[in-house]
Amino acid sequence: MDLDQIVADAQQSFEGAADITTLENEKARFLGKSGALTELLKGLGKLDPETRKTEGARINVAKQQVEAALNARRQALADALLNQRLAAEAIDVTLPGRGAGAGSLHPVMRTWERVEQIFRSIGFDVADGPEIETDWYNFTALNSPENHPARSMQDTFYVDGKDADGRPLLLRTHTSPMQVRYARMNRPPIKVIAPGRTYRVDSDATHSPMFNQVEGLWIDENVSFADLKGVYTDFLKKFFERDDILVRFRPSYFPFTEPSAEIDMMFEHGKNAGKWLEISGSGQVHPTVIRNMGLDPERYIGFAFGSGLERLTMLRYGVQDLRLFFENDLRFLRQFA
């Protein structure tokens, strides 16, 4: 038996295989059930013990050489296939890069951050509170009586469960509950804004079931309505970055302030010139609310205001439909990037 010839033939056959399928077929000629080396191993049983031992060792060495040649060719074909695939996917580094588009803040979040920045610059703290609120903090503490229409299911989202004192839970209808929460944890003078999400059963071009609001509160011994007018007028001029803004305070009613006022603004120039635009509710904090804060209404007084962040954003950017802020249309949002 010429084992050297078998090994040489196998190496030559493997080297000539152009692909894995051909290589596996060539492998069967030498290592398959009827392969040359397999037949030699089957024939060892006919030999005497001494010869069988010697020939068996020679055949095993030849088999190892054939398997080594087979594995080497397999690796070479795999490497060639990989190189071919990489070449097909090659990147021309001389081409101009496409780049990834940079993200940007949502326009309402831009307003949120801008409002915080402006009020921080004039000494206000920024606070946050729970969106799932108790009936007491959302209504009772703010001087809303038990039979107030806002407590109805048609205006307020109530949730299952009650608080530790057995009071109903709801999605807060405004950020005003933070007035009482913050004042109970801090002593006057209190200057704070509380931006956050609020919820009401309402949906049209100017209202959304979920909207963002910023509450402002200033409590001290000698805070007047004149301070409210000065602070809010200065805020509007900084927010809109223009001085041609007229502000008026219309008498109104809110259970948590007395006197109460709606704040309107008007631009002297531009496409909205001459139009009064409702911007916020405000007023002097009601003595009952101050008492619920744990403070003496005979000593402390202050003002509060509540402004819709979507409303401010609509006026700043000239958006006509509030619902556009919630549709996640990139064509709309990219305008503010």
UniProtKB/Swiss-Prot annotation:
Transmembrane segments: none annotated. InterPro entries: aa-tRNA-synth_II (IPR006195), aa-tRNA-synth_II/BPL/LPL (IPR045864), Phe-tRNA-synth_IIc_asu (IPR004529), Phe-tRNA_ligase_II_N (IPR004188), Phe_tRNA_ligase_alpha1_bac (IPR022911), Phenylalanyl-tRNA_Synthase (IPR002319), tRNA-bd_arm (IPR010978). It is found in: Cytoplasm. Gene3D superfamilies: Bira Bifunctional Protein, Domain 2 (3.30.930.10). GO terms for molecular function: ATP binding; magnesium ion binding; phenylalanine-tRNA ligase activity; tRNA binding. One of its GO terms (cellular component) is cytoplasm. Keywords: Aminoacyl-tRNA synthetase, ATP-binding, Cytoplasm, Ligase, Magnesium, Metal-binding, Nucleotide-binding, Protein biosynthesis. One of its GO terms (biological process) is phenylalanyl-tRNA aminoacylation. The keyword Membrane does not apply. Binds 2 magnesium ions per tetramer. Its EC number is 6.1.1.20. Disulfide bonds: none annotated. The keyword Aminoacyl-tRNA synthetase applies. Its main location: cytoplasm. Belongs to the class-II aminoacyl-tRNA synthetase family. Phe-tRNA synthetase alpha subunit type 1 subfamily. Tetramer of two alpha and two beta subunits. This is Phenylalanine--tRNA ligase alpha subunit. It comes from Burkholderia pseudomallei (strain 1106a).
